[in-house]
């Protein structure tokens, strides 16, 4: 029994790191301004960076820090941005089509003309976010998120307050 246990432990130790862990080389690529569709950017620090037109579509950006970054015209389509920090970031013309922004914090972020078609916003904090010219937003999406009186939305849409 002990021999089998040690054999299993040896096999597990020989396997590469978890597929869910960060990929430092892919994170470094994006930090240098290179597109990286489908990359594993889990917990990446992209704060304060200027990354216009970057393509991280389908990437795993869960728990990433994009605070105060400028990512105008970036492609986040189908990316996982759940539990990410987007505080004060600029995303003019960016695509978040079918992206997962569940429980993301986007307080004070600017989303001028950004596309939110089919995006998941469950539990997202959009307090003070500027989304007045955002496209593809629906009331159903916003009903699952929260904001405050300073959240700017397209005409006819509203958002429940954060608690």
Model features per residue range: what roles?
Residues 1-4:
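Positively charged n-region of N-terminal signal peptides that target proteins for export
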Residues 6-16:
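Bacterial N-terminal signal peptides
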Residues 21-163:
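Tandem repeat scaffolds
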